[in-house]
Structures are given as C-alpha cells and as structure tokens.
C-alpha cells in the first residue's frame, strides 16, 4: 500500500497591531481554521513585523497575547498544528540576515508596499520597512512551506521570497521549497463600509468603516446601518456600479452560504434597511460564539502562554534545522553541539 501522501505545509502570519476586523476574519483567520483538516499548518503572530511602526511596548505585549487567544477561539488546534509568536523563534532573524545578503538593493527598492508606506509616512522610513520582505521570506522559507495564504497586497512579497529561494538554490544547491500563494475561493477581500472601493482596515480614522471581531451586536447593527450603499434601492451584485451593496452581499454570502442570485431574490422588493439589518444579524450571530470562547481563553493566561511556549518549541525544531543547513552551505563555521 502506498504511504499516505505527505500533507502540504502552510505558513501564515498576522500582525498583533490591534483587534482583527471582520475583513481579517473572513479573508484570513476563518480560513485558517478551515485549512487545518487538509494541511499541516504553522500560524504565526508576527510581532517582529509590527516593529516597523513604533509600538507602545505594553500594548504590543498585551495585543500579542490577545491575538493568540483570538486565534485559539476561532478554532486553531494547537495540538495538531503549530501556533507561535515570531520573536519566540530567533532562527527567523538569523535566516533573514543570510537571505538579505542574497537579495539585491534594487529588488527591495521596487517593492510597491515599501514605496506606498514610505510615501505615506515620510517621517519614518526605517531600514526594517525596507527589508521587511526579507524577514517575510525567512518566515516562509525557514519551514519550507508549500503554500502561503496571501492577500492582494502581499503577492509581491511572496514573489520576492520565491526569487530569493530560487537564487539561493541556484548558488548553493537545493535548499528551499519554492512557496506558492494560496488564495481562498470565497470572500477574500472585504471592503470598508464607509468607502467600499477600499479595503476594510482597522487603521481607518472612521470607526464606522470597519467591524472588529470583538464588536458587540449593538455596534455591529449600528455600523451596518450606516454602511454606504447607493440610491437605486435594489439588492444586486455589481462590484463596479454597486460596490457598497456588493460588499454587503459578500459578507451575507459568507455567513449564510447563499449565492448572489439567491440573496438578490431574498431581498427583492425590500429596502436596503431590511438587507442591512439581515447582514448585521448573521454577522453578529457568527461572531458571538467566537467572542464567548475568546473571553474564556483570554481569562486563562497560563493556558495561552503554555500554548505559545509549546508552539515556539515545535517551530524552533523545524527552523533551527533549516538555519543549520543554510549556515553550513554558506560556509559559516559551526561547532559540534
């Protein structure tokens, strides 16, 4: 009998920069839980990446623990898979240096996210922001991940990770797996409720533009009521001419499993008020059990820390093996342990 085919490995990370939004939930975290049955998963709280923006130390610590608790609450299984904090696995930064020495200045200069962010915050264009894609490449390559769930804004970073891996393999012999992007089938991108042509973001100054995973039902209803739609009063999917309504349909579809045609039929002849309330109801109902579980897990600080300690140990075993191999290949002297 043939051995069971080796499961592919997935690595994904999320920064602990505030509570995840409904967009993060639908686009990423919810899928993380669903991927567990088919893949070996490593899920990372990317705290080192957060340092490209100056953080309040106590807040960063608290949010790191909160994010870990939230990931456990959505159903990440820390026994079957690996949940860890990036800074707890020092090998990431060790590999990042070697990779940086195999990355061209020009390649990093061309990264659109670097150009966008440095234009937006010209007062803080730090070296970390510039070499961010190298650390991200290290995060992925250190585990020889086969697949990386990425949003549109990160595809370029995945490309450079593949380029760096391919170049390193070419010079030093086969070392790294070339990772591929994994784009989930449904609802990958949830837009702002206030400006439905741009992505929902927790850094938005208008608090009505996003829904946080921890928002209570009243807040959810209030924010959906204020969501921007259009004046034609028909629930119909069309991203170009009806971005607001289409975004709400996307959210409704995610939680009900209904197709756009079914949703259009359900609300035929009804106003947007009814539709918005229905979207708010299904969203609040979907988030309620996650919120209850989150509160329960967060209250058990020792458990969260135990999970993270265990995750760091398991991640480090894989990561250290890669770094050791890379150090040997590039000629760094290693002494017998």
Question: For each of these PLM feature ranges, what is it?
Answer:
Residues 3-11, 16-138, 282-285, 295:
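N-terminal Rossmann-like or analogous alpha/beta NTP/dinucleotide-binding catalytic cores
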Residues 14-16, 47-49, 146-147, 204, ...:
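Short, histidine-centered active-site or binding-site loop motifs used for metal coordination
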Residues 22-24, 162-337:
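Conserved nucleotide- and phosphate/pyrophosphate-binding catalytic cores
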Residues 56-57, 147-151, 235:
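Short, polar/flexible loop-turn hinges at active-site or ligand-entry regions and domain interfaces
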Residues 103-109, 142-149, 253-263:
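Short helix-capping/linker segments at secondary-structure and domain boundaries
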Residues 116-168, 172, 192:
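Internal, conserved structured core segments that host functional sites
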């Amino acid at each position: 009998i043939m051995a069971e085919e080796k499961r592919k490995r997935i690595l994904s990370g999320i920064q602990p920069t505030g509570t995840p939004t409904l967009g993060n939930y639908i686009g990423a975290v919810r899928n993380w839980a669903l991927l567990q049955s088919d893949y070996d998963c490593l899920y990372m709280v990317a705290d080192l990446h957060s340092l490209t923006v100056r953080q309040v130390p106590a807040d960063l610590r608290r949010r790191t623990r909160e994010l870990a608790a939230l990931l456990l609450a959505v159903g990440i299984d820390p026994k079957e898979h690996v949940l860890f904090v990036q800074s707890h696995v020092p090998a990431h930064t060790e590999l990042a240096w070697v990779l940086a020495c195999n990355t061209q200045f020009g390649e990093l200069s061309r990264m659109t996210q670097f150009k966008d962010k440095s234009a937006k915050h010209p007062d803080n264009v730090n070296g970390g922001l510039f070499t961010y894609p190298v650390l991200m490449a290290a995060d992925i390559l250190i585990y020889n991940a086969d697949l990386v769930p990425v949003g549109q804004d990160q595809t370029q970073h995945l490309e450079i990770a593949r380029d760096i891996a391919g170049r390193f393999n070419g010079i030093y012999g086969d070392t790294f797996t070339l990772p591929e992007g994994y784009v989930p089938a449904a609802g990958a991108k949830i837009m702002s409720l206030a400006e439905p042509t741009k992505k929902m973001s927790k850094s938005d100054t208008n608090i009505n533009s996003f829904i946080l995973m921890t928002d209570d039902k009243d807040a959810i209803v209030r924010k959906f009521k204020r969501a921007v739609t259009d004046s034609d009063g028909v629930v119909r999917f069309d991203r170009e001419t009806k971005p607001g309504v289409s975004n709400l349909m996307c959210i409704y579809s995610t939680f009900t499993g209904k197709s756009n045609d079914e949703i259009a039929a359900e609300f035929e002849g009804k106003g947007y008020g009814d539709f918005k309330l229905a979207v708010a109801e299904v969203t609040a109902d979907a988030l309620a059990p996650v919120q209850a579980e989150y509160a329960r897990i967060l209250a058990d600080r020792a458990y969260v820390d135990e999970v993270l300690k265990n995750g760091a140990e398991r991640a480090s075993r894989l990561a250290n093996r890669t770094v050791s191999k890379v150090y040997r290949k590039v000629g760094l002297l290693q002494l017998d342990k």
